[in-house]
Amino acid sequence: MKQETALKLLKAGENVFLTGSAGAGKTYTLNQYINYLKARKVPVAITASTGIAATHMNGMTIHTWAGIGIKDSLSDDDLKRMKERKYLKEHLENAQVLIIDEISMLHAKQLNLVNQVLKYFKESDEAFGGIQVIVAGDFFQLP
């Protein structure tokens, strides 16, 4: 798929997995979409599975953004305590788009926790609380 086609899908609000080898244009396409969202004042969470990847996109780790840290599971009490944290509550409830770069470095358990957190904060049974989710990465580039 060409970058223009991917960008059209992103602008249409579709959930998208961008993949390709190094230099394929994943980051370029993400940055174009991020600029598009920011110009329209759409709240976007720019995250990555690693700190280095997050800083390259002026974002933060998905673990920090979602408030999951290094946890493997979250109880109802954990979620209630998380909702009491003003900063976490505001950005999780306001987010309309979630971008996760270097998805291949994120364990499925952590992705499930992000889903659990967003469903709780958005008070929705939809996947990821119903927000648009864009993941990018190359599963052939595993450690």
What annotation goes with each model-predicted range?
Residues 1-143:
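Conserved ATP-binding/catalytic motifs of P-loop helicase motor domains
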